[in-house]
Each structure stands twice: as structure tokens, then as C-alpha cells.
Amino acid sequence: MNKVFIIGVCLFIVSQAVLAVPWDSDESSDERLSDRSDESREEPRKLVVSDDDSREDSNESAEVRRRDDSRESEEEPRKLSADTSDEDSDDSQESPLDLFFKTLRDSKISRAQRAALLKALLSRYAGY
């Protein structure tokens, strides 16, 4: 009885945290993309440099930034492909709690679907 109560309390706390978090990450990523595109549309800034040495330093730092940006853009698709391959592999061997948290990480699930999923878990494990 004590374990059931603890599991119920834990699931309730998780449910409150999950329902309180805005899961509209698609909109925020669209905003970030539009911000980046606005930045790229701006005219390039002209640097007025008196020394040739400082000009070389600024060119080197710009090259380093470009390399870092290209690395980040290359790493993101790799992470996404790794995540999708893990999900497709062995869904039948995962516990219901693993499926629950994996589903919660999916940004396309609605608030009502999260609540229904949580209710199903509570009814199965806590007897509510």
C-alpha cells in the first residue's frame, strides 16, 4: 500500500510539472529561425581597421565562428537521426513508463493527450 501511495504521489508531481510546461517548441524554433533569417538579411557591417594585424585577427575570428556554426548545423541532424533510430528499434521491450516519458518528449502531443496518458498510467499502476 505504501509503494502504491508513493508511486501515485510521484506520478501526480510529474503530471503537474508536465502540464505546467509549455510544449510548443515548434513555435519557438520557428521564431528562432525567423530571427536568424532577419539577421542574415541585414547589411554586412564594415570594419574600419587601421592595422593590418588587427584585420587578420578579425578575419581569423570570423573564420572560427563560421566553422563553429557549420559544426553545430552538422551535429543537429546527427542527433535527430540517432534519436529516431532508437525509437524505431525495440518499442515492444520498453516499459510503459519509458514510453510515457518518450511520448512526453514529443513536442506534437497535445495537453489533452498528455492528461489522458497520465490518467491511464495512474489507473494502471496506482489503482485510481
Curated annotation (Swiss-Prot):
GO BP terms in the entry: developmental growth; intracellular calcium ion homeostasis; response to hormone; shell calcification
An example molecular function term from Gene Ontology annotations: calcium ion binding
Keywords: Biomineralization, Calcium, Secreted, Signal
Tissues expressed in: Posterior caeca epithelium of the gut.
Post-translational modification: Phosphorylated on Ser and Tyr residues. Calcium-binding activity is dependent on serine phosphorylation but not on tyrosine phosphorylation.
A single cellular component GO annotation: basal part of cell
Keyword Calcium on entry: yes
Coiled coil: none
Compositionally biased spans, kind Acidic residues: 84-93
Annotated spans, Disordered: 23-95
Highest taxon listed in the record's lineage: Eukaryota
UniProt keyword annotation of Secreted present: yes
Principal localisation: secreted
UniProt induction comment: Indirectly by 20-hydroxyecdysone.
Signal peptide: 1-20
Compositional bias segments (type: Basic and acidic residues): 30-49, 56-81
Localization per record: Secreted
Other comments on record: Binds calcium.
Function: Plays a role in cuticle calcification. May induce precipitation of the calcium stored in the posterior caeca as calcium carbonate.
Name of the protein in its database record: Orchestin
